[in-house]
């Protein structure tokens, strides 16, 4: 079962959500990831994946994997900010790689 860690960027995004129903759904999705069930996900590029949450404006969580035991949540957003969020997540993933 993978361990899930978050970046400060992800924590700020998640903390800023006002829709409590969305927060519950997103947290439930993260809990399922910890059980090894990723659900609706697709690879983006450079080891960054997009997890889609079908609620409200179409929430997205961007993450990377380190082996099979570690998931790092890089950033979040919704369909309206998807392009910028992907670029931000890729930058976060690169910074993590550089710190290795």
Annotate each language-model stretch with its function.
Residues 16-18, 22, 45, 53:
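Helix-centric, low-specificity signal for extended rod-like, repetitive segments
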Residues 28-55:
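A short, surface-exposed loop/turn module that caps and links secondary-structure elements
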Residues 1-3, 48:
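A residue-level signal for beta-strand positions that form part of recognition/binding surfaces
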Residues 7:
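PIN/NYN-family metal-dependent endoribonuclease catalytic core
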Residues 3-4, 12, 20-23, 38, ...:
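Enriched for short, Lys/Arg-rich terminal
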